[in-house]
């Protein structure tokens, strides 16, 4: 009943909701329940000052009142199989890692192609477990017509807010309801008024029987990833360096957002989903830090590694693992720190991330229709004072905390021109076309009609800022960061045998 590929089982009633959450089917008409925070983006998307579903909740009284959503999907796990032997066929330990990767890709391709043809809406991926000691293929069926059915007011769905988030037990009505739709043959289909509620192979029947302390509980869904096996120095970096810095940066963003959201109902709706995303990781990182300290995780890791080192003293394959990991994590620290600040203080600025996304769309020849949709979606939920004030704070933090050798030369050049980060930010917002929808459309129309779109885009200071930091990150930070992590993965692969 738990997992079967030959008959309906619990796996057919549990779905992966939009790639990041679990959801469960609770009726024979495709009704599914997930967390309120998992459905929050679409509750916000449908909200307005006139119809504030975030504040008041939403309930579809009929099928016709259910709300279609953009950019949403649910995936059913069809099956998962151990394909280690097939994937590693032809592997020789003397191979380089790049040759091994090529072999794995070549051996995986036929498996993925065959599995993807097994049914409508099927897709497959081959993923490593235990740092490449084992490989599984996961086969999914994906549905994209998923409609909002109901959600409680945020006073219920987010009761306790950040104080209770990531804490247990807690008392909150953290749920929302959606319905999966399919074509007349019960297969995945793009949104259409002709689609009908999906008929699941299996669904969970809700019980209102009394529950007692100690009753058996079985949790079924799609959990996140574990870092259970990481090295002690990785734990130290997370608790002592990475999380404190990232939380500080997000605290400043949250303070700015909260200030303006409290002043305007429209801005509150615009930034509710963004604010939840920022605060969710902010609270998680606090819990990680406190948990590592409370449980003495670093000290326990160190003790275990010392015992491992004693055990490995007469085993050549394992003898140097811990010293090598110590050395590599020391080399990695600067690049990890620069990566954290690139993501949390540079790309965290909306205008800069918007510029990056536009540049990516142009480089992939997405076309005018795609760009029009991007512009419309961006400015629907954009409030310049929040972005500008946050940018001032985040760039100042970058200047204060990131060592010179980890910065792009562009940073020093601009500081020579403007003198302060505040003056630099003011210049960007005073001269960039990306601060208004009209200015953005004019700029992009010019770029679309130009023989060289990059020349047009790079005349705008927001694009220059985005491009310079991104190129520096890719060339000077991410390249060594990736290489060192590759070496760490190789050591973990041996460590986990």
Task: Please give the residue ranges for each predicted region.
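Terminal presequence/propeptide segments associated with secretion/organelle targeting
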Residues: 1-497
């Amino acid at each position: 009943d738990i997992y079967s590929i030959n008959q309906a089982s619990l796996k057919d009633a549990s779905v992966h909701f939009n790639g990041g959450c679990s959801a469960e089917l609770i009726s024979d008409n495709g009704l599914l329940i997930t967390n309120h925070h998992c459905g929050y983006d679409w509750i916000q998307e449908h909200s307005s000052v006139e119809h504030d579903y975030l504040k008041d909740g939403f309930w579809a009284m009929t099928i016709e009142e259910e709300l279609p959503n953009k950019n949403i999907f649910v995936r059913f796990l069809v099956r998962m199989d151990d394909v280690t032997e097939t994937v590693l066929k032809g592997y020789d330990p003397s191979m380089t890692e790049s040759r091994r990767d090529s072999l794995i890709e070549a051996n995986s391709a036929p498996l993925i192609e065959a599995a993807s043809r097994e049914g409508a809406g099927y897709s497959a991926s081959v993923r490593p477990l235990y740092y490449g000691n084992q490989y599984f293929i996961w086969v999914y069926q994906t549905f994209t017509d998923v409609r909002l059915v109901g959600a409680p007011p945020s006073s219920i769905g987010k009761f306790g807010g950040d104080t209770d988030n990531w804490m247990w037990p807690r008392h909150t009505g953290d749920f929302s309801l959606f319905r999966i739709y399919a074509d007349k043959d019960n297969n995945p289909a793009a949104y259409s008024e002709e689609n009908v509620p999906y008929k699941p192979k299996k669904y969970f029947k809700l019980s209102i029987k009394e529950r007692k302390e100690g009753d058996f509980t079985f949790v079924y869904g799609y959990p996140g990833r574990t870092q259970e096996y990481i090295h002690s120095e990785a734990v130290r970096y997370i608790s002592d360096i990475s999380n404190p810095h990232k939380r500080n940066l997000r605290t400043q963003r949250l303070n700015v957002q909260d200030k303006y959201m409290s002043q305007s109902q429209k801005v509150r709706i615009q930034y509710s989903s963004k604010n939840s995303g920022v605060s969710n990781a902010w609270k998680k990182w606090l819990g990680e830090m406190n948990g590592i300290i409370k449980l003495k995780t670093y000290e326990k890791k160190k003790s275990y590694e010392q015992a491992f080192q004693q055990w490995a003293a007469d085993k050549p394959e394992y003898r140097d693992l811990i010293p090598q990991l110590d050395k590599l994590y020391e080399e990695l620290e600067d690049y990890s720190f620069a990566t954290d600040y690139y993501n949390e203080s540079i790309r965290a600025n909306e205008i800069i991330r918007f510029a990056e996304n536009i540049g990516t769309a142009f480089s992939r020849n997405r076309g005018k229709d795609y760009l029009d949709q991007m512009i419309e979606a961006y400015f629907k939920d954009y409030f310049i004072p929040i972005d500008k004030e946050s940018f001032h704070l985040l760039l100042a933090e970058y200047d204060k905390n990131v060592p010179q050798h980890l910065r792009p030369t562009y940073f020093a050049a601009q500081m020579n021109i403007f003198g302060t980060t505040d003056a630099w930010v003011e210049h960007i917002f005073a001269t960039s076309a990306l601060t208004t929808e009209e200015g953005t459309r004019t700029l992009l129309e010019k770029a679309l009609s130009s023989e060289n779109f990059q020349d047009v885009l790079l005349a705008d200071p927001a694009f220059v800022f985005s491009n310079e930091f991104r190129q520096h990150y890719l060339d000077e930070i991410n390249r060594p960061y990736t290489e060192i992590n590759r070496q760490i993965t190789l050591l973990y692969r041996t460590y986990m045998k």
